[in-house]
Amino acid sequence: MKSKYSKLLKNRNLKFGLSLFAFFILLVVLSFIAAPYSYQDVFPDFQLAAPFWKSASQSQFLLGTDDLGRDLLSRLLVGARFSVGIGIVSTVFSIMIAASLGIVSGYYKGRVDKTLNQIMESLQAIPSLLLALIVIVVLGSGLLNTVLSVTIVALPSMYRLVRSAALVECSKEYIQASEALGASSLRIMAQHLLPNCLTPILVQSAVCFSDAVLNTAALGFLGLGVQAPYPEWGTMLSDAKNFIEVAPWLMTIPGFCLLLLILSTQLISDGLRDQLDPKLRNRA
């Protein structure tokens, strides 16, 4: 077991991606214990205050303030809760739903497989952001509906990967032997199919997380995601777009955080695929 983990950690992409992701988890923790101010605190005398590298005399707000005089560092830390939190929660939900449906579809085949395929193909035919917008328009904006919308967007890709892996496993002799010995369908799916589908689930989960973060930010930027006063990073970008010429740091700092967070999960996905896919591992 230790040798497996050591081989995984030798992958540069995986190591760098995990390090970056750990940094954002640290930001989430710091938002509870080390945020200088509340994200709602307003300082009217310090509207659009410059960050420390532009104004050496201004040390009260390290990253400056927004147009209302709210501390950007505090809002950035609290915003990490929403961006990272929504990404994790929606990814977990999409794995639970799509993996279950994919295994059921791959095992039972027939009408069940056909029905689920038609549903997922219908969802996948709609561009991801447009699908998220449709869900938001139907259900309304807000935190819970944002989580639901990005979860639904992630379902088709996860479902197809798990279904393909389940179909491959179902064609193997040990599944047929288990059925001949009288093992129940639930036992076969839980004890045999699910463990052998974990590799594509792990790889795709990192991709689902980055897609969830990106879609959440896009919805927030359009004013349809997490609503004020909560400082989700996409919402912060939307609030700052009118001040990009006079206070560009209001957009560049949250935007750079989004870039690094998405980059970290993409690197994790690439590293996991390189190490867990036998074809790529043998080629390397």
Regions found by a protein language model. Give the residues of each.
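Gly/Trp-centered helix-boundary motif
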Residues: 1-95, 99, 103, 110, ...
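Transmembrane alpha-helix boundary and packing residues in multipass membrane permease domains
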Residues: 24, 103, 132-137, 146, ...
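Short helix-capping/hinge motifs at transmembrane helix termini and TM-loop junctions
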Residues: 31-39, 106-110, 135-141, 153, ...
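Glycine-rich helix-loop "coupling/hinge" segments at transmembrane-helix boundaries
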Residues: 136-138, 150, 165-166, 214-257, ...
